[in-house]
């Protein structure tokens, strides 16, 4: 291994070393140390010497890979900071929790930087294995173990599909390199059946990890059973990493026979997720089904023109992640010995008890719904515009209808926030870590909606 390759891997090595080191720290320091480690890894990704480093045969070291690593590291740091309240009230195994969070970030970074089918498998499975445990790690939560099992069992099937698909693609093309495998698969006319089957299985595995319908059935139960910070991390980072590799080094939309299947997954996700979210009274289950809809929107970025779709997709990932982490973080900030607020009724009268929580939650939910001038509106505007320019008129019309209907299920909990409720229990004050995260989430949601230009220039420069 050359010095340049070592520099390219430095952020990943920091994450790996940090995940081991925090196991030897005290419970009180583990979460904060893990958050600092994630931020340091993000900093090393932009270290001048690292910027000049070449990639390795398995992972890239371009601006796209470094930008994605920065986002995953910041999401991991936010998860650790938002989980600090659980350490005292929920008897959280903080050291193991912190180590697994860093390991999940490491898997996401490897996945989004993958240039080989081997690193794609390693990154995806590293991330998934960490989440298996993180979902069930809260010993005070009786539904956590059940949620972990519901994520584990279908995950085994998805991993088997992915491994079998990779084997078929290698048999058809003779290479593990992603770009070469896609090019060789498309070289024949028609595409060899074994290659098409292999890519279809890989796409099915990715659809499970991103909870695209009909591979989403695990999502509502897992979100409900997992702690709020982990549910937010799963909804943003885990799914975001899958779409990052689909937008970057593994653009499955270039394989023409897969485009109708991707379009079908997008349409089914928007329809199924919207209809299911309408019936929910549990906030975390509603957010789970709405995330299925948002993943359907992101498929439009994968299908769209390469450069426009990537810019729109990355911007949407950023704005969706900020709103999602902030929303789940607000639920986590209200946790007590009795657990997290679950049903809409638990939010009743929150505006009178904690006005800032109510205002923040309202703004983040409105951004997810796509209300201007918040970032969610701008994200949908550019995403739907890119898909429309690429000729996907039917999918864009369906996305617009789905977005319009989503206003109902996003506004329902908002109405509960501002109802008057006598004798409602008090909620704890924000701690310093929570204040920092909520200011950042609210800032991104507002600034990216009002001044999106700098973000698009940054994402345009990141295109591989």
Swiss-Prot record:
For this protein, the Enzyme Commission number is 7.1.1.-
* Tagged with keyword Zinc: no
Q: Which GO terms describe its molecular function?
A: NADH dehydrogenase (ubiquinone) activity; NADH:ubiquinone reductase (non-electrogenic) activity; quinone binding
Q: Which reaction does it catalyse?
A: a quinone + NADH + 5 H(+)(in) = a quinol + NAD(+) + 4 H(+)(out)
Subcellular location, record wording: Cell inner membrane
Which Pfam families does UniProt cross-reference here?
Answer: Proton_antipo_M (PF00361)
Database matches in InterPro entries = NADH-Q_OxRdtase_suN/2, ND/Mrp_TM
Which Gene Ontology terms describe the biological processes this protein takes part in? ATP synthesis coupled electron transport
Disulfide pattern: none
GO-annotated cellular components: plasma membrane
The protein, known as: NADH-quinone oxidoreductase subunit N
Q: To which species is this protein native?
A: Syntrophotalea carbinolica (strain DSM 2380 / NBRC 103641 / GraBd1)
Annotated gene? nuoN
């Amino acid at each position: 291994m050359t010095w340049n390759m070592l520099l390219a891997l430095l952020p990943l090595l920091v994450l790996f070393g940090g995940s081991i080191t925090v196991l030897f720290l005290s419970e009180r320091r583990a979460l904060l140390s893990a958050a600092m480690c994630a931020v340091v890894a993000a900093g090393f990704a932009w270290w001048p010497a690292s910027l000049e480093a070449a990639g390795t045969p398995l992972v890239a070291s371009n601006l796209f890979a470094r930008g994605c690593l920065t986002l995953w590291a910041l999401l991991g740091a936010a998860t650790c900071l938002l989980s600090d309240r659980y350490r005292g009230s929920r008897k959280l195994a903080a050291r193991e929790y912190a180590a697994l969070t860093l390991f999940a970030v490491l898997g996401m970074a490897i996945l989004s930087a993958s240039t080989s089918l081997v690193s794609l498998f390693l990154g995806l499975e590293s991330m998934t294995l960490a989440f298996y445990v993180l979902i069930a790690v809260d010993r005070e939560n009786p539904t956590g173990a059940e949620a972990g099992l519901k994520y584990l069992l279908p995950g085994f099937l998805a991993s088997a599909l992915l491994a079998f698909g990779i084997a078929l693609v290698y048999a058809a093309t003779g290479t593990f390199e992603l770009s070469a495998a896609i090019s060789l698969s498309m070289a024949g006319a028609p595409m060899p059946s074994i290659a098409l089957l292999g890519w279809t299985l890989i796409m099915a595995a990715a659809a499970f990890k991103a909870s695209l319908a009909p591979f989403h059935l695990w999502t509502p139960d897992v979100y409900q059973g997992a702690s709020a910070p982990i549910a937010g991390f799963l909804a943003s980072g885990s799914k975001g990493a899958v779409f990052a590799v689909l937008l970057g080094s593994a653009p499955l939309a270039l394989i023409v026979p897969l485009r109708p299947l991707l379009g079908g997954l997008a349409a089914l996700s928007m329809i199924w997720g919207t209809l299911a979210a309408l019936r929910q009274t549990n906030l975390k289950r509603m957010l789970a089904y709405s995330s299925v809809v948002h993943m359907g929107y992101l498929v439009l970025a994968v299908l769209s023109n390469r450069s426009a779709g990537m810019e729109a997709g990355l911007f949407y990932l950023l704005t969706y992640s900020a709103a999602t982490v902030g929303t789940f973080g607000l639920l986590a900030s209200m946790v007590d010995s009795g657990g997290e607020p679950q049903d809409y009724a638990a939010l009743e009268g929150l505006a009178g008890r904690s006005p800032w929580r109510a205002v923040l939650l309202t703004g983040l939910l409105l951004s997810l719904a796509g209300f201007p001038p918040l970032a969610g509106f701008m994200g949908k505007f550019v995403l739907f515009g890119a898909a429309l320019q690429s000729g996907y008129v039917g999918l864009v019309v369906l996305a617009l209808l789905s977005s319009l209907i989503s206003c109902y299920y996003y506004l329902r909990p908002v109405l509960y926030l501002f109802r008057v409720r006598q004798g409602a229990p008090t909620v704890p004050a924000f701690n310093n870590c929570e204040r920092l995260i909520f200011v950042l989430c609210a800032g991104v949601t507002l600034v990216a909606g009002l001044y999106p230009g700098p973000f698009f220039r940054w994402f345009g420069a990141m295109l591989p």
